[in-house]
Every structure is written in C-alpha cells, then in structure tokens.
Amino acid sequence: MSVAERFISIPVEVCIPVTLPNPFTATRHMLHGGDYNPDQWLHRPDILESDPELMDRAGVNTVSLGIFSWAAMEPNEGDFRFDWLDDVMDRLHKKEISVLLATPGAARPHWMGQKYPEVLPVNAEGVRQPCRGRHWFCRTSQVYRDKVHTINAELAQRYQSHPALLGWHINNEYGGAPGYAHCYCERCLAGFRSWLRRRYDDDLDRLNQSWWTTFWAHTYTDWSQIRPDDPTNESCLLNWYRYQSDLIVDFARHEIDAVKTFSAHPVTTNFHGHMSFFDHREMASLLDFLSFDAYPQIEGSAADRDRRRWVSYVSDMVRGFAPHRPWVLLESCPSQPQHKPLARLKRPGVHRSLSLQHVAHGADGVMYFQWRAGRGGKEKLHGAVVMHDTPADTRVFREVASLSSDLNRLKPVCGSSCPSSVAIVWDVHSEWAWQCNHGLTSEPSPRAQLPAHYEPFWTRGIGVDIVDSTADFSAYQLVIVPGVFLLRPGFADRLMAIATTGCHVVLHPLTGWVDDDLCVLPGGRLGPELREACGIYPEEIDFLRPDERVLLEPSEWVRGDAVKRCDLVRTDGAEVMITYQSDFYAGYPALTRKEYGQGAFWYCACGLEAQGYDRLYARLCEIAGVSGPLKTESTSLVIRERRSEETRFVFVLNLTQTPNRVSVGAGWVSALTGESISDEVVVGANDVLILSQPIEGR
C-alpha cells in the first residue's frame, strides 16, 4: 500500500511488474546523447530536419525527449497533440537514435494552475503560491496526480511499440531545489499527521515521549496540534523531511505505474545535487537503472583537484544506492554551464577526461544537458552540443564526436561492475538530522565530511562504495563511518555482524549521537551496543578553533596533529594505539582498537589532518588486505577498476597538464587502441589510459 493510499486516500493504479533487460547489456553500447527539446523549435522545421543528421555526425545514439513538453503535448485540457512528437520519434529512428521518452510532470502548464488552484503549493505561512518555475506543485493534489497519470498513460499507450523507444525518463530531478519540494496545504498537513499516526502506532503519548515534547511545554494533546513549520521542534521537522521524502518516492511510483500499465520498457529518473532531497535508496528500488546529473566547475585553479575528487565520490555514491543496477550520467555540460560563479570554458580534453572518469566509476553512458540550447528562458546561456541556431562546426561539437569514438570502443565495458572492498557510510537520515539539529554549527555536515575520508583511497586507486546504513556490508573488508550522526535501528547490529566475520570497522567522533527521533542515545554517545563493541566510553568532546592543534603521540598509525575535534574517551576493553600529548587531553586515547570476532572495531577519537587520515587508512588497508589494481606514488592519477565476467578494465586518468608515469605490469592491452602495454607507461597531460586484461581462468 502506497503512502498516498495509506495517508491521503488517493487511489493508485496497479503496476504490471514486468521489465525488459537493462538497456546497457541489451544494446551492448554506451549511451551517448542528451536532452532534446524539439518543442522549443517547432517554428523552425529546418532545425527539426537537421537535428538527427547532426546527431549522427556527433555520434549521438540516445536522447532524452520531452522532459518539459507538457504545454506542447496538451496545450489545453484534454487536447492532446502528439503529431509533432510522432514526427520527431520517426526522424530519430531513421538515424538509429534511441529515445528515453520523458514524462512531463516536472513542469505543469499554466492552464492547469489557473483552472485548478489546488495543484499549486502552499508556503509555510499558509499562502497559496502562484504559477512559477518548475516542480511547483502539490504532490498530494488529487487533480495533479490524475493529470500526471493521464498524460503518462497517453504517452505509454501511444509509443509502447515505437522502434525508437529505449526506455522512460520519469519526471526530472525530483525534489527540484531547496524550497521546491514542500507544500503546507491542509491536505499535506493532514497527510503528515496520518503518516505520524502510523509511525507511532496511533499512540500520541509514544510520540510525545519519543520527541521529548516536555521541553518548552510542546506536549501534544491532539494530533491536529502537530505542525511542521516550527524549526525549534527538531523531531517534528526531521519526521516532516521523512514524510516529504515518502511523498516524492510515492509520486514517482504513481508515475511509473501509469507508464508500466502499457510499456515494459526500463525506467529511470535523474538524481542530482547533494542527494538529500529524498531517500535515494528508496527511490532506486523503483528504477530499472539509475542516472545522475553532474556539473563540476573545472576552471584551471587549485580547486580543480577537489572537484575531480567529487566526480569520483558522487559516482560511487550513485552506484551505492543500488549496487547491482546499471547507471548512466544523464546530464552533463559539454562546455560551459551557466549557473557557476565563473563561466569558464572547458579546456581541450577536459570534457573527455571528465566523461571517462564517470565511466571509470561505473557509468554506462554519457549524456548532456543539452543537445541544442534554446534561444530564450532561464537556461539559454547554458552550454550545449549545438548552441542555438548557430553552425555546428565548433570545437565542442568535435570533442563530443571524438568522445563518441572512445565510447564505441568501450562496448565491452558495458554492464561491468566496480569491485570495492571498502565502504564509506553516508546516510540521508543523518543529513536531515544534522540540518534539523541545533548546535555543533562549527562542524561540517555528514556529507561535507566525506572528502577527507575518501581522499586516501582515491589517491591509491582503491575501490570505494558510498552506501547508507541499511546497506549489506558483507562484501567489504573495511567500513568507514565518518559521521552517521543518527543511528538507525539495526545499524549497530550489522556492523557487529560484519566485524565478527573479519571486517575492520572504523568509527569517528561525529557518529552515534542521536536516535531515530533526534534524541540523544540512551547512556550517551554511540549507544550501548557500539560502546561495548568499541570497548570505550565517550565522556566529552571538545571542538577546536581552526588555528588549534593538539599533539599526538608519534606512531606508525598517523602523521601530524589532531585538529577540529578531540573526543575524551575512557577505555573499557579497547587497546590504546595512540594518546594525546598536549593540553589537558594528554594521556587520553586518540585511537583505539578492540578485536571483535575475526575483525576489529577502531575508534579515531580526533579529527586529523590530511596526512593523518592518509597514514591511518594506509595502515588499515594493509591490515585488512585491501589494495588497488595498480601501484603508484602519484597523487595526480585517478585509477579505477571495472570487471566483467571475462575481463578486467583499469582506467588511469591524469588530472594534470604534466605527463605521469605508472607501472602496470605485464599482459595488458589498451582498450582504446588495441596496443599491447606492459611495465611502465606514460599517461599524457590530461589524458586517459584504459587497460584491459582477461581474467585468469576465463
């Protein structure tokens, strides 16, 4: 039973639970293309005629079509006009270009908001908002859900057998942007209260106790008193975020059901931004393949390296939402994104390098926003393969065509996996809890803590999955828990289970502060299970000024000083590996270990400098038996492995303008040229080397 059915009495049609094989192994080629918006050019038939020919020249094999086209598909209520879409689909098919056909519900036409005001959202002050922007609708509106279901079903019924149809692009960037996702109309508030009644077994006393509502006399005596617009009520706000997430996921389910009533083709929707608009793992369970939009700003500055690291870890995060399903980079910019502070052009070769970096981390396709830029609207200056109605013989067009040649040579990579022995845990419920929490404002959010812990593995080419606390950890040899502020039920048990079988689990001080309702854990931080597993008791924690350093005992385990935070813990069965050496912290444990079954729990009680994390994780990799596919001393190379049943593929990307050497050993072949490669090889400036080698015994 869906969220809608349970809490707001909206009927949801039954979905036919049939899907085709994933589009990557079925077609056995990398998807390459982009968002295509012919509805913006219906007044220019010459452009509509020329686009498929230009796409063919650029090596485009797939487009996302019709994403914001509702007004062109249904200019007036019930007046469906698909003739133009028929023509576009037919033209694309003649050039053997596949289509991810979009459902248009991310932006409703103006006539709908005018005729049915209930589809428009209400702000926290109770004011109905006018038509504007996109994602500007109420997800509990029966009218809006009916209209979305109707247009989706019309599309699916009409195009289910069209030979160009590869799959369905459901909606676009669910969650929109901050402020877009939440509606405070009475229907949404009633739905929230019903959602809470189910969560707390219709027991208001239990809710009051769980939320600690005696603070500031917030005790509720009737469910109708609960409102989510008071930021001081942290537990209420956290559950409002969860409710909103469930609404978004349920809305996606509603859209998918309408499509799959008629079409069994695979579905996706594009994730984006900072991944905390909703629970992406829940959304991923609805999708046949995942997709993501990435717009890193590469500007030729020292910050570029951090942005390239972001490309890697966000790709690992997307893959972690559904580890056994394929994913594709559904939006990227081939040139100059308009929404960055500095409108910097990509230097020659950067687009290729960035695109193949996503492929190295599991993407089975590279697509763009946008194929052709529109002449008007908010994104008219955003980069595209073809800019407006200008000639296509440009540097950007040529680079896109060149990348297409590379992707064609990488067909054997399609459907291959990214082996990882290390997991870093990031949980959206902790992110929401951090946003709702008052205090600790000097500390980075759980998401902002990821780069420091990801970096040591990234520089060594060690595969990492970024997963949430509900994941299956059984395949990992090393699990890092940097800042799971909120402990969800069962997480401690899963960590103890994998440690028993040989995994090394590393906890850090911003983990395990609050329970599922944002109240401090019983008995203090970490909770009773993890305190016992770690063999420590955290007594108090100090947060340091940016200029402060606390000396650490010289050891093999870390380099440098303690920074940012110093946790003062006492041991209760743990072995002390390092102690603090200065101030009143001197003598307290800074790093502890407790053997647990065949593995161990480690507790790093302080923040570390980059060199400190680098040394700590290098030692833990040695102990856990974790290594990358190639050994290199360079910190300017990205190395990532993918594996099919028969072949290993190792990607080596040089992030600098200086050639880099790497030792690869014997038996490799270039996946791009077929040339045999062995021993030491030079990777050119801003270049990419892709190695392939048969797996022994295959």
Regions inferred by a protein language model and the residue ranges of each:
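Carbohydrate-binding surfaces of carbohydrate-active enzymes
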Residues: 226, 295-698
